[in-house]
């Protein structure tokens, strides 16, 4: 079935969406507003890429530039190597048909059945009746709503409505699917179901999925690439794993703090130190779980003792990452070796206190 409903496979450039030094400005009564400022990014064909930012970061403008609803003030946006801004509206229509989109509020026609909602873009594209019926049947099966074909949207749950939205967005076999805050109105369990379906869209159909979100949990669950926007600037481009393991911007670090266990604050540090009076507390940030395990194995051979006294772990696209606080004790030289080992695997490994490291005769038991 996946082969039947996938986009047509013709040779295409591997860089599916490219922003080249894109700036977008809007004129207002109070002056010029710069929505995007010199943004350059590349979204690979067949990837799941997330664009994350707070309200006003420029996410919506970026989406409208991808589907050609806005043109850059300067720079270029290339989709499949084509600069939409150089085309007439007529020339852009077939290219826009290659981009599907789903929304936070579903945007379904309440007076139409689920079948007719999915049929809508096919009718606009003048599909033959037999082909239209076959396509809708395939899509409703793919999203798990075959039994709901003749229901109306008000008979469906939020998650089911978003599944209809996905089926409709895929109707004309687009090679790109834009998901604009598509899970923001859903509960966590339903969000997970929708994200799982988007993964299938990508894996089984080969569709390039671009997720626009303000939720780091969505990025963690689905993204291979991530672009972090702040006040119109691209502050963190790269793979999702890079962003989680080695966040370069304060914005990314704040987003990460919402989903991964943070290091102890001052009061918690004081409590942990009082519970481990002879230990040196070391924070280890954004470390891969397997690397952390290897580091602890090496520390066990230094003569230092260790105990994990605080921490949290998250699963990301291709592994797991964690923040930990480790209590180290033993001979001073051994503890220094242990700190160096932790620094090798950590984005940031540093003592949280200036506690005196005990000598061998003082060592805690």
PLM region spans:
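A short, proline-enriched helix->beta-strand linker immediately N-terminal to the Walker B motif
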Residues: 171-175
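Helix-to-loop junction immediately C-terminal to a conserved catalytic motif
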Residues: 67
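Conserved ABC ATPase signature
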Residues: 152-156, 160
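A short, surface-exposed alpha-helical micro-motif characterized by mixed small hydrophobic
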Residues: 219-221
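ABC ATPase "signature
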Residues: 237-238, 246
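ABC ATPase NBD coupling module
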Residues: 28-33, 84-100, 124-129, 243-247
